[in-house]
Design a protein with these regions (language model features):
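Serine/threonine-rich, repeat-prone extracellular segments and beta-strand-based repeat modules
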Residues: 30-83
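Generic structural signal for short, solvent-exposed loop/turn connectors between secondary structure elements
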Residues: 13-19, 51-53, 84
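Extracellular interdomain linker/stem segments of modular secreted and single-pass surface proteins
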Residues: 1-3, 82-85
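Solvent-exposed, low-complexity, repeat-rich "mucin-like" stalks and linkers
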Residues: 1-35
Length: 85
């Protein structure tokens, strides 16, 4: 089976800066946690942010991520992260 992602949050985040593992986790078929690569972040106003999880306004952020398992199976995901004041 290819790797799978899971969001680590329930509900809204507060404005601030986060680590990837605060928000999204990935595992391989044997449930080993995998490194996640941040591809891009789009803020609620459509701005493409630098490669960091820095949420400075309320709204929905679109976070594109990628992971790869030991068998070189790659999986991409786009996760919508709601941020509230």
């Amino acid at each position: 089976a290819p790797p799978h992602f899971e969001t680590a949050i329930t509900g809204y985040l507060k404005i601030g800066t986060y680590q990837m593992t605060d928000i999204i986790k990935a595992w391989d078929y044997a449930e080993n946690e995998l490194q996640i690569q941040l591809m891009k972040v789009i803020s609620p106003d459509g701005t493409v942010l630098e490669n960091k999880l820095d949420f400075q306004m309320p709204g929905v952020y679109e976070v594109s991520v990628m992971t790869e398992d030991h068998d070189n199976r790659v999986r991409y995901a786009v996760v919508n992260i709601p941020v509230n004041e």
